[in-house]
Amino acid sequence: MEESPPKQKSNTKVAQHEGQQDLNTTRHMNVELKHRPKLERHLKLGMIPVVYMKQGEEILYPAQSLREENLIQNFTSLLLLQKLCPKDPENMIRKSWASCVPEEGGHMINIQDLFGPNIGTQKEPQLVIIEGAAGIGKSTLARLVKRAWKEGQLYRDHFQHVFFFSCRELAQCKKLSLAELIAQGQEVPTAPINQILSHPEKLLFILDGIDEPAWVLADQNPELCLHWSQRQPVHTLLGSLLGKSILPEAFFLLTTRTTALQKFIPSLPMPCQVEVLGFSGIERENYFYKYFANQRHAITAFMMVESNPVLLTLCEVPWVCWLVCTCLKKQMEQGRVLSLKSQTTTALCLKYLSLTIPDKHRRTQVKALCSLAAEGIWKRRTLFSESDLCKQGLDEDAVATFLKTGVLQKQASSLSYSFAHLCLQEFFAAISCILEDSEERHGNMEMDRIVETLVERYGRQNLFEAPTVRFLFGLLGKEGVKGMEKLFSCSLHGKTNLKLLWHILVKSQPHQPPCLGLLHCLYENQDMELLTHVMHDLQGTIVPGPNDTAHTVLQTNVKHLVVQTDMELMVATFCIQFYCHVRTLQLNMEKQQGYALISPRMVLYRWTPITNASWEILFYNLKFTRNLEGLDLSGNSLRYSVVQSLCNTLRYPGCQLKTLWLVKCGLTSRYCSLLASVLSAHSSLTELYLQLNDLGDDGVRMLCEGLRNPVCNLSILWLDLSSLSAQVITELRTLEEKNPKLYIRSIWMPHMMVPTENMDEEAILTTLKQQRQESGDKPMEILGTEEDFWGPTGPVATELVDRVRNLYRMPQMMVPTENMDEEDILTSFKQQRQQSGANPMEILGTEEDFWGPIGPVATEVVYRERNLYRVQLPMAGSYHCPSTRLHFVVTRAVTIEIEFCAWSQFLDKTPLQQSHMVVGPLFDIKAEQGAVTAVYLPHFVSLKDTKASTFDFKVAHFQEHGMVLETPDRVKPGYTVLKNPSFSPMGVVLRIIPAARHFIPITSITLIYYRVNQEEVTLHLYLVPNDCTIQKAIDDEEMKFQFVRINKPPPVDNLFIGSRYIVSGSENLEITPKELELCYRSSKEFQLFSEIYVGNMGSEIKLQIKNKKHMKLIWEALLKPGDLRPALPRIAQALKDAPSLLHFMDQHREQLVARVTSVDPLLDKLHGLVLNEESYEAVRAENTNQDKMRKLFNLSRSWSRACKDLFYQALKETHPHLVMDLLEKSGGVSLGS
């Protein structure tokens, strides 16, 4: 439902054109009925702002219909993806397919978050790189930042001065001083240079198009401090700024097409990367309203585009959206019927030329324009003087025409000219290559020269990413050649042009893997023969990735590709159909249920939202499937309209899909009528997988109607039969009997009850077969293997936990856990195992797992430093985690993220501490809305002994607008229960009278840690409230100093906050301090403990804690020498046996930078051996431990292997647990010495 906008006067100005009506009035509208409500809504919300053009800027709107101010509102809804920090800055993420599952690429952000904490480092970046494809809106976004700052809407508190530079213009200057550079970056002087430079941390430099000029921005004088008035070459000045030898505290925003910035900015520090992905769905539509001054024209144009999924997808790129609008506007002006059948950007450009360039200029003047464009591309020039134009043979009349039609622009600040957009210049350059080559003056030599020029300009690795190369592929396709011949009234030599394509492919393919760039080129070409031939050559041998442990043999033919946008999705799905080595297309990898991935498949990953438009273009491309036989959409939540579009595609005559997976897609009985319509049609579908969907009896009956149709070709149907009634199951069996080719299979077979106690394997199998025959279940096959556990419900799959250790898990223990406490759940599991005779079989789970209907579900560490965890609950039910004491009741499969928070981060900003007492941990929980019906938040108040009312318990929510106190639905021992919760940082507090704080009984825990140093034992003893975030903080702190926890029972009695306790023990123990206060301190604060020096622990010792006031014993523990586990497992021998691998230091660089928490002891051990005095002090001078480690690794580039071995030995001595953890995660072997 749309929210009603606030009644306020809009400050949005509106463009007017030649007496056209004002867009803010609706009195005289005469538009199509379909779009009237939508347009009126946009007008009320102020979503149709004015758009202006500023001379000399890459703004893609016709000058005659727009004013010359306020560019800011044009691209406010560009999709921005903040990437995770690259592991190797010199080899940024390439969009090529691989055999392993890719790591998640980042998350979507708003423009306000560009200089917010980075998702990888949690630091505010000094350098932000805006990257993206050609024409995606990077430059406009950069100008938006400058304008929004100037108007006080963005970063006003962060920066005092913001300077904007177009690098294409900056490259025209030979030498500049810092003062001249700053003056050039301001529209008007704002302050004296001395005042500006006095606060460099408040300066932002925006460098637009940093990769356009042919320069290398090296820091030539890193040690030289230059005066701001001293002039030097521009590239040197910029290199010094980016290299931090000048104004090291300043901030930078760079825009670039390429991610390989290290090539021409060698001193570039680690940036925050943000990729511009183009327009969101609503912004595509809004653009039409911005472009056309006449609202009816806007509606008509967008309706035409919206009816064509390919054209709508192409409009995701702002530059292409401008191209489409311009073509439609020209057709309107010329009185033509609106028609755009273009399927590619190249075809749109040819259409644009045919509509805008008069016939008299096409033969000679357009060729001259193409030569000008090509010369500029090869020399990295985008600005041209009048003499440049004359040199290419462009006359005044032609230049005036090109300016009038918008092909060329004249710069207001100079006498220079430029193309309306860099992409347009690259398109003309591509035409120039073909026209020159087609003259056949030099034959193959000319082709070699063109290809070598392309390689020199873009590099082999980025050749297919270059728009010029993509345009070449498009122009040399059959439709492209026809368009050029018609445009230039000439005949092009097809064979010669085809040779040029093969030259490009041969030159580049050996140097790069199959990537999205190549697919883009092939898509532009659209030639079926070329697509088939090239895609056939891409087979290669795929090696299983590190995450492919479950099906190592079967998944060697699985390839993975990340597609972030609808454009990439369209290109990938179009080309993959010609790839004969892929039989199945899968969108977003989901762990499969009950079937093996046998067919060769391509898995497409997408971290950005999948919209209706995304599904539309996917299904549009699948109407002609060619080599594809299977489609797997498992794990994607599908709306009804999406399934409707899918079924329309499946019924299309050209669609030859045979297998469809819709496992866990949120389907209900309502969807079954759509699927039944496919079964009743002459579709090619033979296998359908519908497990883990709530279809119900009614839905399955609809499917049965489709299955009864004589034209139905389905032979295999997978369903969950456990929730179906006996009547429907009988109906399915009857269908199988009547149709011998039909097999209906199920994961669960609950009606099969076999007493398996004291039966051997043969007896179990025999009994199962007999029972199936007796129940008439013969057609239904029980899918199981020799590795499964066969029991009352048939085969139970054994899950591989660790292949190297031969560790397996049997998770299928069915326990109703609703309203059960931790102890009840564990007891129920034990009882069930005893009753089933499963005593020898251990359920492999830990206290960190969530225990639910099918046993333990592992918790995944997302970000260790932030204490951020993720658990994927596989089905509806109740789940409890013993270590955190969190408890969720969920209605369906859901992924939940849990972050441990510190109360001090939030409470310091509120008066809550005076009236309320913290009585539980603080969690930041994220889950899909509606999936969690109840959450049990732990508290440590003893209800049986407290006089506090359960009405005094509150759940504190910390939200953007402030804090909210919510009354829980229920309070029970150890938990408060919220039903249908909304999530934010949340935890339990208790309303109190301040004087009563020390009379609240709480449950507490004791934590004991030990460290053995040369056979002398030191213990640390803590007494703290039962709060998992505090325990985790203590664990982490003790681990820094190589202390290991010993598990001992907690105090039996309830204790009181503020009470004091005496620590004592056996004779000859040195205890400091001997008195402990039980207090609640936030997990970020220092926790109180007693240090106990034992000496040589040859025999057992006793520890006791007594209440100081009454000297009552509240806790006692006996420590034996056997409680002290060996410090480290075998490492040395593993290292001796290791082959020649990457050194431990290099292999674990990222983890060491993030996790070495005490650098100075490490430096002390390296001092004099590896580090000289200067290097030692240089590392110590860094502010943070992470910066110190980065500096140390920077110095290590010149180290020999022997020096790295010394580093490894020092690290083992100072951080043995970290070394151990890294070795275990890497398989136990990493060459260090």
Swiss-Prot record:
<keyword id="KW-0832">Ubl conjugation</keyword>
<dbReference type="GO" id="GO:0072558">
    <property type="term" value="C:NLRP1 inflammasome complex"/>
</dbReference>
<feature type="domain" description="NACHT">
    <location>
        <begin position="126"/>
        <end position="435"/>
    </location>
</feature>
<dbReference type="GO" id="GO:0045087">
    <property type="term" value="P:innate immune response"/>
</dbReference>
<dbReference type="GO" id="GO:0006508">
    <property type="term" value="P:proteolysis"/>
</dbReference>
<dbReference type="GO" id="GO:0016020">
    <property type="term" value="C:membrane"/>
</dbReference>
<dbReference type="GO" id="GO:0070269">
    <property type="term" value="P:pyroptotic inflammatory response"/>
</dbReference>
<dbReference type="InterPro" id="IPR025307">
    <property type="entry name" value="FIIND_dom"/>
</dbReference>
<dbReference type="Pfam" id="PF17776">
    <property type="entry name" value="NLRC4_HD2"/>
</dbReference>
<keyword id="KW-0645">Protease</keyword>
<dbReference type="Pfam" id="PF05729">
    <property type="entry name" value="NACHT"/>
</dbReference>
<dbReference type="GO" id="GO:0050729">
    <property type="term" value="P:positive regulation of inflammatory response"/>
</dbReference>
<dbReference type="InterPro" id="IPR011029">
    <property type="entry name" value="DEATH-like_dom_sf"/>
</dbReference>
<dbReference type="GO" id="GO:0005737">
    <property type="term" value="C:cytoplasm"/>
</dbReference>
<keyword id="KW-0399">Innate immunity</keyword>
<feature type="binding site">
    <location>
        <begin position="132"/>
        <end position="139"/>
    </location>
    <ligand>
        <name>ATP</name>
    </ligand>
</feature>
<keyword id="KW-0547">Nucleotide-binding</keyword>
<dbReference type="InterPro" id="IPR027417">
    <property type="entry name" value="P-loop_NTPase"/>
</dbReference>
<keyword id="KW-0391">Immunity</keyword>
<dbReference type="GO" id="GO:0042981">
    <property type="term" value="P:regulation of apoptotic process"/>
</dbReference>
<dbReference type="GO" id="GO:0030163">
    <property type="term" value="P:protein catabolic process"/>
</dbReference>
<comment type="subunit">
    <text>Interacts with DPP9; leading to inhibit activation of the inflammasome. DPP9 acts via formation of a ternary complex, composed of a DPP9 homodimer, one full-length Nlrp1b protein, and one cleaved C-terminus of Nlrp1b (NACHT, LRR and PYD domains-containing protein 1b, C-terminus). Interacts with DPP8; leading to inhibit activation of the inflammasome, probably via formation of a ternary complex with DPP8. Interacts (via LRR repeats) with BCL2 and BCL2L1 (via the loop between motifs BH4 and BH3). Interacts with NOD2; this interaction may increase IL1B release.</text>
</comment>
<dbReference type="Pfam" id="PF00619">
    <property type="entry name" value="CARD"/>
</dbReference>
<dbReference type="InterPro" id="IPR032675">
    <property type="entry name" value="LRR_dom_sf"/>
</dbReference>
<feature type="site" description="Trigger for autolytic processing">
    <location>
        <position position="957"/>
    </location>
</feature>
<keyword id="KW-0378">Hydrolase</keyword>
<dbReference type="Pfam" id="PF23679">
    <property type="entry name" value="UPA-FIIND"/>
</dbReference>
<dbReference type="InterPro" id="IPR051249">
    <property type="entry name" value="NLRP_Inflammasome"/>
</dbReference>
<dbReference type="GO" id="GO:0012501">
    <property type="term" value="P:programmed cell death"/>
</dbReference>
<dbReference type="InterPro" id="IPR041075">
    <property type="entry name" value="NOD1/2_WH"/>
</dbReference>
<feature type="site" description="(Microbial infection) Probable cleavage; by anthrax lethal toxin (LT) endopeptidase component">
    <location>
        <begin position="44"/>
        <end position="45"/>
    </location>
</feature>
<dbReference type="InterPro" id="IPR033516">
    <property type="entry name" value="CARD8/ASC/NALP1_CARD"/>
</dbReference>
<dbReference type="Pfam" id="PF13553">
    <property type="entry name" value="FIIND"/>
</dbReference>
<feature type="repeat" description="LRR 1">
    <location>
        <begin position="627"/>
        <end position="647"/>
    </location>
</feature>
<dbReference type="GO" id="GO:0008233">
    <property type="term" value="F:peptidase activity"/>
</dbReference>
<feature type="domain" description="FIIND">
    <location>
        <begin position="850"/>
        <end position="1133"/>
    </location>
</feature>
<dbReference type="GO" id="GO:0032731">
    <property type="term" value="P:positive regulation of interleukin-1 beta production"/>
</dbReference>
<feature type="repeat" description="LRR 2">
    <location>
        <begin position="684"/>
        <end position="704"/>
    </location>
</feature>
<keyword id="KW-0677">Repeat</keyword>
<keyword id="KW-0433">Leucine-rich repeat</keyword>
<protein>
    <recommendedName>
        <fullName>NACHT, LRR and PYD domains-containing protein 1b allele 1</fullName>
        <ecNumber>3.4.-.-</ecNumber>
    </recommendedName>
</protein>
<comment type="function">
    <text>Acts as the sensor component of the Nlrp1b inflammasome, which mediates inflammasome activation in response to various pathogen-associated signals, leading to subsequent pyroptosis. Inflammasomes are supramolecular complexes that assemble in the cytosol in response to pathogens and other damage-associated signals and play critical roles in innate immunity and inflammation.</text>
</comment>
